[in-house]
Amino acid sequence: MIVRWGLGRLPELLRGLGIDRPFLIASERWTPLGLSGAGRWTEIPSDRIDAIAGDAADADGLLAVGGGSAIDLAKAVSATTGLAVVSVPTTYSGAEWTPSFGVRDPERRMTGGGAGANLAGIVYDPDLTLTLPLEESVGTAMNALAHCAEALYVKTRNAEADVLALEGARTINDTLPRVADFLHDRQARTRLLAGADSAGHALALAGLGLGHAMAQAIGGRYGLPHGALNAICLPAALRFNEPVAGAEIARFGAALETDDPVGRVRELAQLGGFERLRDLGVPEEDLPALAEAAAGRAGAKANPRPASAGEIEELLRSIW
């Protein structure tokens, strides 16, 4: 993966990859950037993958500008067409680092997913995050923090991912409170984006755990923000995994400068007002079905402690 900083580096990156006619996938809000190419798709999210692939028939690459929804959409098109993806992330979601993706309809409900995207490059520019609202800033940063935590204890963890996860956790812990208080602080935004970069790279190397499995199951059903759900689900997942991954979770806590990582994660989540699933409108009567769905996801299977649907339901009730 080629990573560059500053939107001004984008033309050079595209040329280096041999992309002369990129197809742009970005919502209307990014029109003022003046990016152009072989066409553009602005309906985000969307599950019209075949239509987008048809519109991109004359393109020699895909350029995604936006958060996880825009980048996931580009990855879905890439998996269909083989076109390389260059991402310009405007949130802290980390979607730019993994070839897997979810497909959502315009109401943000999950309608499919897969893997196999051809990822080629990333351009980070903190200026594009300066208008990100508080809830989305905190939510996507908490998603990045969950990437760090889970990379440290999933079954597929490794030494390289550990280093990146700890660095990402330290940076997010240090800078998220500042960003929450001063949304237009460019220096803090830059550091937080760097922390999310480390977190996303750790995710790509190690994978996801139970917290993400729960968040994905809930978000896919109701179209709820993935970051907000991770902010709520991560403390429960940490608590569940402590009996078998206590040392790894303690290392995560050290990166957060605390001996109570569960409490610190809750504190950071509260910066965005994220506390309980009921606050997001999740119906209590759906918890058993959500637990079943979460138990079947890859993150649950990679978790260091096996989790049955019944155990996951108990966790969901504890945060409902």
Task: Report each predicted region and the residues it spans.
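ATP/NTP phosphate-donor binding region
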Residues: M1-G61, L277
